[in-house]
Amino acid sequence: EPCTDSPLFGLEEVVVTPHLGASTVEAQDRAGTDVADSVLKALAGEFVADAVNITGGKVDEEVARWLDLARKLGLLAGKLLDDAPVALNVTARGELSTENVESLGLSAVRGLFSGIVSEPVTFVNAPSIAESRGLDYSVATETEARAHRSALEVKAVAANGATATVVGALTGLEAVEKIVRINGRGMDMRAAGRNLFLRYTDAPGALGKVGGQLGDAGINIEAAALTQAAKGDGAVLVLRVESEVPEELETSIAESVGAQSFQ
């Protein structure tokens, strides 16, 4: 039977875990390895499926594939706002809607606040940060998914009433994470690498100004995508760049095309 009374229990340097119930050396070794792997995931901010203090319920393999994309969509939706977020609505569409997707909402909240607060945002503290910041977040499902078998939609609402909606999907045999819609307009951009976002009123020559300044600074553009701007509405240009864009250059680019920008 496990020890129930020891002076070691009172030491701050000692972390006590529940009795593993492993009756053989091999079982104890495997159980210990599993615990160590879970600790490493938690320290890296990754999702720990068997953690007792994470909300969201059981996470199946299919849902787990979407966790990182949900985080990125939450971060992007928050960046597109020009005021503090007060609500975040996450909707799983298509085949994904048949799964338990509560954890995807949690991951999106984590992404949203990772671009706002200075402290690390984890699956454990994300709900408490949301509560302290007055954020109302929800998770819903819809059977319909435009152009994809499954898609994840994240809508952020700002205190001033402005909204930002981004949609992502896992595409191809390798399940490549992509951003497929921003504010109702289609695009096709990998959700990876270092990206420069510009929200501006599209005009002839604007794209050339942006590319020219980046080229003059020796910054290579690996990929680019531009939303289809509706008449009188702003466009969103996404540039995946090889290196970080200095703040002064980012400001100069934004001013040259009358844009709001972020990386």
What positions do the PLM features span?
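Rossmann-like dinucleotide-binding domain for NAD(H)/NADP(H)
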Residues: 1-80
